[in-house]
């Protein structure tokens, strides 16, 4: 039997996160995915990139320019030799995190040595789709917006599990776990304040690759900062926003994540591959775990996935020096932290803001959590980090990393 091997993250970069219809709106999704890969290649010119065993990218949509295996398209567009294979994985919101976990697992098992993993999503460029007619001359064609949420709903799924919108699932979590509107708004404000402070200090420059983007009539533009944060947000301003999923309700545009565009990529290698290619290990991937919950409370998914991962690794929640939890909604972020025994305002949780401030490009977000955690461990001198996120239709994924 092959002995399990250590897996290392050796470098990690991302694009800025664009607003819906914002600065990255004119960048094709496959081109967007290629940008962080190309940046990694440029940062390591002495590496023989033909030795890559796999490029693994997460993507939640795959109905538009991200069709037909966007990982393969992206690696070719990035100039990686055509002999290198690529695969796209889809676990909706956790696709990018799962891509890293899948590649790490293959390295750990000895199937591969050297990989690039990450994720991409252009929610701006998500297309409308139309089902084919089931009979001649039908006038009942169904058209769906693929930006977010359900489409082409199976009636059995609807009857047995419900097809609540993402915001409605956030309301369900708020109700079931008694998360108040005031607590949600306070959580959202902390996200904005922390992201604003990080941006003002230039903290994200270490992980962001500037994007030369078509600018429409204005011509090309250079995008080098995240567009979504609103650092001037106030508690009073958040309190004025109306709930948009239910009335009465608690989920607002201010305490929910955004609809965004972005891409991220990391280099993964075994110890021997890192040495062979002159790469410096920065973090060890300890493991990944997934779990499932009822679709109507999908936001609580990080709780069982994190518990499963901790049990497997022999860790406790207090062992993590840094936690990056995806803020799909403040309600679910708070519910998860409370269930795991973490304070609402814990300084080591999303210390530079989360998805409420930075944005949530679905397939990219998990990879962003992982790379932000790697940089965060180095900044803090910490040892262990947890990246975790909920997943639409009721799942959770968690990944543990150790600074080296």
Task: For every predicted segment, state its role.
Residues 1-29, 148, 234-300, 304, ...:
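Condensing-enzyme catalytic core mediating Claisen C-C bond formation in acyl metabolism
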Residues 2-78, 85, 172-181, 191, ...:
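Conserved active-site "lid/cap" helical segment
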Residues 14-15, 25-26, 30-35, 46, ...:
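N-terminal extracellular/periplasmic Venus flytrap/periplasmic-binding protein-like
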Residues 27, 59-115, 147-150, 160-166, ...:
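Conserved catalytic cysteine-centered active-site region
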Residues 90-121, 174-203, 265-272, 337-338, ...:
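Active-site-proximal alpha-helical scaffold in enzymes
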Residues 114-172:
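Flexible glycine-/small-residue-enriched beta->alpha junction loops
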Residues 171, 207, 215, 286-357:
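Active-site pocket-lining segment
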């Amino acid at each position: 039997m092959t002995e399990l091997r250590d897996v290392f993250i050796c470098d990690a970069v991302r694009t800025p996160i664009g607003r819906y219809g914002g600065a990255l709106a004119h960048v094709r999704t496959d081109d967007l995915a290629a940008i962080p890969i190309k940046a990694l290649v440029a940062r390591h010119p002495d590496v023989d990139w033909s030795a890559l065993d796999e490029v693994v990218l997460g993507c939640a949509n795959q109905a538009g320019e991200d069709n037909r295996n966007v990982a393969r398209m992206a690696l070719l567009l990035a100039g990686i030799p055509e002999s290198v294979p690529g695969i796209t994985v889809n676990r909706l919101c956790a696709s990018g995190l799962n891509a890293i976990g899948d590649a790490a697992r293959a390295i750990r098992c000895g199937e591969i040595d050297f990989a690039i993993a990450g994720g991409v999503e252009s929610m701006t460029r998500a297309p409308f789709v139309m089902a084919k007619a089931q009979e001649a001359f039908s006038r009942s064609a169904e058209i769906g917006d693929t930006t977010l949420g359900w489409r082409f709903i199976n009636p059995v799924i609807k009857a047995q599990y419900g097809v609540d919108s993402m915001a409605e699932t956030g309301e369900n979590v708020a109700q079931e776990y008694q998360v108040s509107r005031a607590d949600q708004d306070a959580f959202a404000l902390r996200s904005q304040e922390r992201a604003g402070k990080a941006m003002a200090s230039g903290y994200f420059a270490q992980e962001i690759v500037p994007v030369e983007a078509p600018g429409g009539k204005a011509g090309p533009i250079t995008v080098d900062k995240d567009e979504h944060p609103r650092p001037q947000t106030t508690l009073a301003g958040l309190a004025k926003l109306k709930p948009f999923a239910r009335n009465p309700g608690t989920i607002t545009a201010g305490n929910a994540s955004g609809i965004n565009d972005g891409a991220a990529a990391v280099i993964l290698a075994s110890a021997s591959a890192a040495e062979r290619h002159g790469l410096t290990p920065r973090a060890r991937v300890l493991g990944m775990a997934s779990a499932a919950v009822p679709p109507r409370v999908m936001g609580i998914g990080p709780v069982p996935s994190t518990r499963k991962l901790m049990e497997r690794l022999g860790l406790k929640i207090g062992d993590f020096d840094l936690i990056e939890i995806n803020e799909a909604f403040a309600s679910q972020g708070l519910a998860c932290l409370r269930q795991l025994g973490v304070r609402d305002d814990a300084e080591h949780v999303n210390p530079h803001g989360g998805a409420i401030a930075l944005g949530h490009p679905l397939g990219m977000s998990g990879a962003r959590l992982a790379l932000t955690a790697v940089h965060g461990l180095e900044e803090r001198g910490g040892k262990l980090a947890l990246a975790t996120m909920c997943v639409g239709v009721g799942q959770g994924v968690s990944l543990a990393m150790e600074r080296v």
